[in-house]
Design a protein with these regions (language model features):
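A beta-strand signature from Gram-negative outer-membrane beta-barrel systems
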Residues: 107-149, 648
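Flexible loop and strand-edge segments within Gram-negative outer membrane beta-barrel domains
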Residues: 220, 234-281, 290-320, 356-363, ...
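Conserved C-terminal beta-signal and adjacent last beta-strands/turns
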Residues: 10-12, 178, 217-218, 228-230, ...
């Protein structure tokens, strides 16, 4: 009953922070009240390095946006890109590509992750721009004792990965170093077609097809280093550096591929505890991250027909982005309440480079904010109040009709849990949040609209958590009213809309060895008022999704059989160039065995039945290749087998 013990521990944590909604921290789902925890990302999610895929398989309200064999994106309760915040060790990192080739989730690998916490809704006041959710990724921490591990992984479609981690130190200083390298060929769908064969099957113009039909799909190398210096028992300094180097990532449904994606993340943090009556804990944090993303047609045919003698020069588009930020936060106990106040500031630059006519002119988004939280218990009732005031400038170097922007936002929320007893909890929250438009939405050469207002989200959430014996269920409802929602209708515009939905998750321990994990998520999105086009459905609102996993655990081994089922995508925005997708169900198998105290083995097969399906729709916010004015769909992987051998010490 290891999970039941974990559940009790997490319950205690949630009483201190009612707004924390999902945690990925080692993959066994332990949810309590308004929290979900998925554990052992680095140990369990070893099929590939793709964090987006790991999240979508373990959190019902997260859906995968597949663009390639790696570097995929996520949708959280019908929201994507800047509508959800992504933090890596409390640092922001943004992709540089306006076409989402390098989403924030692609800049960290699962083998380096200790935990991922997902807050659904407007219940985060500490970070700039959390409109409808925040994903907080925490990488591994250094240890005092010397520990390490080496992983060797191989899978279908030419996938190979090797990673190594070592950590150790003293009472005063600890250090961790982790590195990895991986590569993969073009995967094949359930019909046996790889990227090139899918292009040919869908009649993609010859000039857009790959010149080398056996071109590798991606190569990726990473480095993570972290250090911790303990000044004394109550004070510490932490430093980290994360490097990601990805080369030749193929995007077969687009007109270009990524020549490379290079990113760097630097963090410095200072923590002091028990400084006196006015400080229970003081945190000072600084981060800097940057991304360099050139994309081109270098790997395509670049001529009209196979017999054509004229080859076009490669088209190249290179963009860079960077952001630095700092935060000071102090917590103090006041009249049996925990009060937190803080200052937060950041500056993000985004620009197209190496061109006289940039698609995005160099633009700086500067935010300054003050925030506060109060956590208080009244008997069986636990409450958290939060508020944040933002002042944001957006300055552009645009030469023609430059329009700098200023935005002011006042946001607040309250979230509560009523504990009937140790097995029954009711929870509810209401809040308002906002996010400003980014440089692409304001100033892009073809789709930008410099008159955009910031988006406001007014949301309510309600649910309960009930355990009956060894059976647990956690249903949750949400209703979100979006004012001035930023929407791509060919050009960006503000519209009014609403998104509402339900998710249900839980577990059932049938015996000491058998257990069942389940989850379901459903959401709908509708436009209100005036909008371009005649379709009332919102784009990128995934259909009904269900997850069911049967586990059999013994002392040193574990068997898992999993089904992921998705309904047909028949509510879609045709005016935004989406289309109907068929439903599907995918069956996965996994086996792990601790062969020796130092050696572990994992075997798995995803999509056992070799199902052919497409999970991702074709919203016009992303540029897709078209055939007869129809955007081409891209099938997900067919049957995929993998094996991982781990040596730890």
């Amino acid at each position: 009953m290891k999970r039941f013990i974990s559940l009790s521990l997490v319950t205690t944590a949630v009483l201190l922070n009612a707004s924390e909604v999902t945690s990925l921290d080692t993959i066994s789902v332990v949810e309590t009240a308004n929290s979900k925890i998925v554990k052992d990302v680095s140990d369990e999610q070893i099929k590939s390095a793709d964090l987006a895929e790991a999240l979508s398989k373990n959190v019902p309200s997260i859906s995968l946006v597949r663009r390639s064999g790696i570097a995929n994106d996520i949708i959280l309760r019908g929201q994507k890109k800047d509508n959800i915040n992504i933090l890596l060790d409390d640092a922001k990192i943004y992709g540089a590509c306006p076409n989402r080739m390098d989403p924030s989730t692609s800049h960290v690998l699962t083998n380096n992750i200790q935990s991922v916490k997902v807050i659904e809704g407007p219940y985060d006041v500490e970070n700039f721009g959390t409109l409808s959710g925040v994903v907080k990724v925490e990488t591994k921490e250094p240890t005092k004792d010397v520990h390490g591990e080496i992983n060797l992984n191989a899978g279908s479609f030419g996938y190979k990965k090797a990673s190594a981690t070592v950590s150790g130190g003293t009472d005063r200083f600890k250090l961790l170093v982790s590195t990895s390298t991986e590569e993969g060929d073009q995967y094949k769908d359930g019909n046996g077609n790889d990227f090139s064969e899918q292009q040919i099957e869908k009649n993609v113009p010859y000039t857009n097809q790959y010149s080398n039909t056996k071109q590798k799909a991606f190569e990726k190398k990473t480095l993570l280093t972290k250090g911790q210096f303990n000044i004394n028992d109550d004070q510490e300094i932490k430093l980290s550096y994360t490097a990601n180097r990805s080369d030749n990532i193929l995007y077969p449904t687009g007109s270009m591929d990524a020549d490379y994606d290079d990113s760097n993340i630097y963090t410095v943090g200072y923590t002091a505890r028990n400084l006196g009556n006015f400080s229970k804990e003081l945190n000072l944090d600084y981060y800097y991250s940057d991304v360099d993303h050139p994309m081109s047609t270098t790997l395509r045919n670049r001529k009209m027909t196979p017999n054509s003698m004229m080859t076009m020069d490669p088209m190249v588009s290179r963009l860079k982005t960077s952001i630095w930020g700092s935060k000071v936060k102090n917590s103090v106990e006041v009249a049996d309440s925990l009060v937190t106040v803080g200052l937060d500031t950041s500056v993000r630059n985004w620009r197209a480079v190496d061109t006289a006519t940039p698609s995005i002119p160099s633009s700086d988004t500067t935010n300054k904010a003050i925030f506060s939280k109060i956590e208080k218990s009244f008997g069986k009732l636990d409450l958290e109040f939060g508020t944040r005031y933002d002042y944001t400038d957006v300055d552009t170097s645009k030469v023609v009709n430059p329009e700098d922007k200023k935005y002011v936002g006042l946001n607040a929320n309250v979230f509560g849990i009523y504990n009937i007893d140790e097995n029954t909890k009711y929870f509810a929250g209401v809040g308002k949040s906002s996010r400003v438009p980014d440089a692409r939405e304001l100033y892009h050469s073809t789709a930008g609209n410099s008159t955009l207002e910031q988006t406001k989200n007014y949301e309510a959430d309600v649910g309960f958590d009930k355990t009956i014996g060894t059976f647990n269920i956690r249903p949750k409802l949400f209703y979100s009213v979006l004012k001035d929602y930023i929407y791509n209708s060919g050009t960006f515009e503000n519209i009014d809309a609403k998104i509402y939905g339900l998710d249900v998750s839980g577990f059932y321990f049938m015996t000491e060895n058998f257990s069942l994990d389940y989850g379901m998520a459903y959401q709908r999105g509708k436009k209100d008022g005036e909008y371009t086009g005649n379709d009332k459905d919102l784009a990128e609102i995934p259909p009904l999704k269900g997850n069911l996993a049967l586990n059999y655990e013994m002392t040193k081994s574990k068997y898992t059989a999993e089904v992921v089922a998705v309904d047909s995508w028949d509510s879609y925005d045709s005016s935004a160039r989406e289309q109907e997708l068929g439903g599907y169900a995918v069956f996965n198998l996994k086996y792990t065995n601790q062969l020796h105290k130092n050696i572990g083995l994992t075997l798995g097969v995803d999509n056992v039945l070799d199902k052919t399906y497409a999970s991702t729709n074709t919203y016009q916010d992303i540029t897709y290749l078209t055939v007869n004015n129809e955007r081409i769909l891209f099938n997900d992987p067919g049957r995929y087998g993998y094996v991982n051998l781990k040596y730890s010490f």
